[in-house]
Amino acid sequence: QDCAMIDYKGGGGGWGYSFKLAYAQRCLVQRCYSREGRHPFVANGRAWGPNVFVDCYATESKNETGSHMKYATGLLYDNVKVKAEKFPGDYGLVVRNRGPFYEHGQMGGQNVFWNCVSLKYNSIPGRIVCETPAHAMNFAIGCKGLRENGTDCNYFNSYNGPDGIYD
């Protein structure tokens, strides 16, 4: 909690993941900040949950925040704000099926985005993708951003009190 990862410099691959949960269960990441992270707040590689990212903020994000690369369950993104890098990237808050793209496939089930915000540079609304697989549910509740087709949402682009589920 109360950590920052600022201006990471390095190559691709697994580098630049600001706050990553892998093989994780019952973890709380709270009030953390990322600047120029490749994947600011992610769970990948069999994060079985419950796991929570609460009151976290990312600026100049270089890629998606959400479950990433293999299946993650029981994730709560509570009042997380992500702002993309200055170049026109298609990033934001994401849980989806990435198909045969490398080893990614379906990235998660039983995940919730609660009162989260996705922005592109210049405060243009950013993308939120919250696909639901056949065997589980994912939710985006009270979030602000661009709702991508196939996204299961409740009260999208509106405040949904309380500020956070976790508080």
Each predicted region: which residue ranges?
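Right-handed parallel beta-helix
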Residues: 1-9, 23-39, 47-62, 71-86, ...
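Short, tandemly repeated low-complexity microdomains enriched for cysteine and small residues
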Residues: 88-95, 124-126
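Long, contiguous C-terminal flanking segments immediately downstream of a protein's structured core
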Residues: 119-167
